[in-house]
């Protein structure tokens, strides 16, 4: 029994209006009203994929991990009990706020709140209308992209995400942090998406380094690059990754030290996949231009 996909992300931020402008006018998501004090944003037929609420954290507040049905949720509850992982069941108010039929609330070993849920609301009768030129995002069985989790102990995090939640290692990249220093990043999948979560001991005081959204076309990436370049947010130029071979760029969000990766064209994981190790993050490109544009 394992998690099936990443369903949603919730952020607590100091500047909600800046995030609203960023997610709609730059990234192209659709504003979708609110739930409690959180503004909601759509990327597809789901009622929401990203939530932004006011808070001093300026970081990822929670991540929603999806299973297929109530029986799968109960199997995950049993697995958590067997592993000695504390959890609570979301009450009716939280289920209504998240627009799901059931959920379990827990934390990973380093304090990131996780919500394992089933039964998300879908609203096909209200088509997704992007707020900026983008043909759409790749979601469905692969979920809403990925995020890179910053952890102090990668081995401990790996044990939790693989042995308890059922993620599987795709590969490792030894990311150069200096002339003689590298950090191994472990990339984990739970469906055809090359990685839904990556784990790395990056020396930044944030829960995540970045989150990624996958667009439908290469032109979507180009148009988004121009919008975010005009906004002065580009941190890495266009490039293609070695492991998943996504063509993408990186840009600052309104919360310091958290970036978005906007990409297209990754390869997918299937039963023939074999684990590999890479010494570079990019086949080409992804030149850092932080503070230069």
Curated annotation (Swiss-Prot):
It catalyses: biphenyl-2,3-diol + O2 = 2-hydroxy-6-oxo-6-phenylhexa-2,4-dienoate + H(+). It comes from the Bacteria. Transmembrane segments: none annotated. Its cofactor is Fe(2+). It holds the Pfam family BphC_D1. PROSITE patterns: EXTRADIOL_DIOXYGENAS (PS00082), VOC (PS51819). Keywords: Aromatic hydrocarbons catabolism, Dioxygenase, Iron, Metal-binding, Oxidoreductase, Repeat. GO terms for biological process: xenobiotic catabolic process. Fe cation binds at residues 146, 210, 261. Residues 5-119, 143-265 form the VOC domain. Belongs to the extradiol ring-cleavage dioxygenase family. Homooctamer. This is Biphenyl-2,3-diol 1,2-dioxygenase. It comes from Pseudomonas sp. (strain KKS102).
């Amino acid at each position: 029994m394992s998690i099936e996909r990443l369903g949603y992300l919730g952020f607590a931020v100091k500047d909600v209006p800046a995030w609203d402008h960023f997610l709609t006018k730059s990234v192209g998501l659709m504003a979708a009203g609110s739930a409690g004090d959180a503004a909601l944003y759509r990327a597809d037929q789901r009622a929401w994929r990203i939530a932004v609420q006011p808070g001093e954290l300026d970081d990822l507040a929670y991540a929603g991990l999806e299973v297929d049905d109530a029986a799968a949720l109960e199997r995950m509850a049993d697995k958590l009990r067997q592993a000695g992982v504390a959890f609570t069941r979301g009450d009716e108010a939280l289920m209504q706020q998240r627009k799901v039929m059931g959920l379990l609330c827990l934390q990973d070993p380093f304090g990131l709140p996780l919500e394992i849920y089933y039964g998300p609301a879908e609203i096909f009768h209200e088509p997704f209308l992007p707020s900026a030129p983008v043909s759409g995002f790749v979601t469905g069985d692969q979920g809403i992209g990925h995020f890179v989790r910053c952890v102090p102990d990668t081995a401990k995090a790996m044990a939790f995400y693989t042995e308890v939640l059922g993620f599987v290692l795709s590969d490792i990249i030894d990311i150069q942090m200096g002339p003689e220093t590298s950090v191994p990043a472990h990339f984990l999948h739970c469906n055809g998406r090359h990685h839904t979560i990556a784990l790395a001991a990056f020396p930044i005081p944030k829960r995540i380094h970045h989150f990624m959204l996958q667009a439908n076309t290469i032109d979507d990436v180009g148009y988004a690059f121009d919008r975010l370049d005009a906004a002065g947010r580009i941190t890495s130029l266009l490039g293609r990754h070695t492991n998943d071979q996504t063509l993408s760029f990186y840009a600052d969000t309104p919360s310091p030290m958290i970036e978005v990766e906007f990409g297209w064209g990754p390869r997918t994981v299937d039963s023939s996949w074999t684990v590999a190790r890479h010494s570079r993050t990019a086949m080409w490109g992804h030149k850092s231009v932080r503070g230069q544009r």
